[in-house]
Amino acid sequence: RRIARRATGEGRSRSIHVVVCGGSIDEWNRRTTDEWNLWAAGIGESASRQAVTSVTVYPLSGSDSRPVEVRRWSVAGVAVTAWPQVDGRQRLADVVDAWPSGLAMTEETLGRALVGPGDIDVVAVIGAPGRLPSALVWELAYGELIDVDVEWEAFTGEDLTSVIEEFRTRHRRFGGLHVDETT
């Protein structure tokens, strides 16, 4: 049913949910709290101007063995979350392990716990083109994949704006292939 809603656009608002995947755990650890706050403010402000309601950020590489805290901001009405876990399977296991005993686990509630509010529209992969984040299987299922050829430390709100502008030019296929109607 959820797939049908996605495919038909039923219940879809004009807001956009973006996943950004970039940097390594070590690069994330080198950022100070002030640097994270400044970065999130720039991302949130740019996202707000583009009708984005949620930006979820994951590292592209590194070891999950060194703990890094989940960071959350609300900037200009945009929920920005930096979730420092490379391994999507471990992230799923952690969410399931921490599931409240009285809360029914459905596809919708599990999805919200894993990726935040709303369906993911676009996945921006930061760094050299062609790097597919295998840990983001859940996020890649129906989100449009866009490579951003900049270094993680240099990714800014302007880059996010470019991602959203490119996303808006695409014909959404929701996991399907483009069919050439002229043949």
PLM feature segments, named:
Residues 1-183:
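Flexible, compositionally biased loop and terminal segments
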